[in-house]
C-alpha cells in the first residue's frame, strides 16, 4: 500500500467522522418531538458553522506548504468564515430559515466559483471526488434542516414572527 493511499484513506476517515454528527443531528430532526427538534435544528446549524470554521483553518494551514498559491488560499480561507458568519447573523436577526437557506445556496454555489474550482482541480482525482461527495451530503443535510423550518404542519418558524 502506497503512502498516498494511506494518506487519502486517513483523510477520508477524518472527513467522514467529522460530518457524522451533523448527519445524525439532521436526521434526528424528523424523529424527535417538536420542542426537541427546535433545539436540534439550531444545534445542527451551529455544528455546521463550526465545521466551516475548521475548514477555514485547514485552508489557512495549507498556505505554508503551497507558496505559489498563498494569496489565493488566503482569500479562499476567508470564504467559509464569511459564509458561517453571515448564515449565523441572518439566522439570529431574521430567522433560521434565511440563515440555513443562505448556507445551502452558498455551499452549493461555491463549487462553481472559478478560483475555488481551480484550486480544487489541482488536487488528485480521489480528493476531488471526495470533496464532491461531501458537498452533496452537506447540501442534503442543509435541505433537511431547511424543510424542517419551512414545514407547514408544525410551523416551527412562527416563533420568530
Please tell me what each predicted stretch does.
Residues 12-15, 68-79, 100-103, 126-136:
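Cytoplasmic-side transmembrane-helix entry/capping segments in multi-pass membrane proteins
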Residues 9-30, 136-142:
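The first (N-terminal) embedded transmembrane alpha-helix
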Residues 90-108:
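Transmembrane helix-loop-helix
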Residues 144-161:
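Juxtamembrane boundary at the C-terminal end of a transmembrane helix
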Residues 50-51, 103-116:
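Alpha-helical transmembrane segments and their membrane-interface exit regions
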Residues 59-90:
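Helix-adjacent hinge/juxtasegments
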Residues 3-6, 33-41, 56-69, 116-123:
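Short juxtamembrane and helix-loop transition motifs at transmembrane-helix boundaries
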Residues 113-140:
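Interfacial loop-to-transmembrane junctions
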Amino acid at each position: 500500500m502506497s503512502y498516498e493511499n494511506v494518506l487519502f484513506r486517513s483523510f477520508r476517515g477524518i472527513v467522514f467522522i467529522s460530518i457524522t454528527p451533523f448527519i445524525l443531528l439532521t436526521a434526528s430532526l424528523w424523529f424527535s418531538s417538536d420542542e426537541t427538534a427546535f433545539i436540534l435544528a439550531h444545534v445542527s446549524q451551529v455544528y455546521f458553522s463550526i465545521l466551516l470554521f475548521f475548514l477555514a483553518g485547514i485552508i489557512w494551514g495549507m498556505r505554508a506548504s503551497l507558496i505559489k498559491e498563498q494569496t489565493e488560499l488566503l482569500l479562499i480561507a476567508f470564504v467559509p468564515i464569511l459564509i458561517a458568519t453571515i448564515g449565523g447573523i441572518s439566522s439570529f436577526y431574521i430567522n433560521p430559515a434565511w440563515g440555513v437557506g443562505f448556507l445551502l445556496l452558498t455551499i452549493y454555489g461555491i463549487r462553481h466559483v472559478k478560483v475555488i474550482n481551480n484550486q480544487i482541480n489541482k488536487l488528485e482525482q480521489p480528493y476531488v471526488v471526495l470533496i464532491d461527495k461531501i458537498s452533496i451530503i452537506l447540501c442534503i443535510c442543509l435541505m433537511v434542516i431547511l424543510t424542517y423550518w419551512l414545514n407547514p404542519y408544525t410551523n416551527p418558524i412562527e416563533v420568530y414572527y
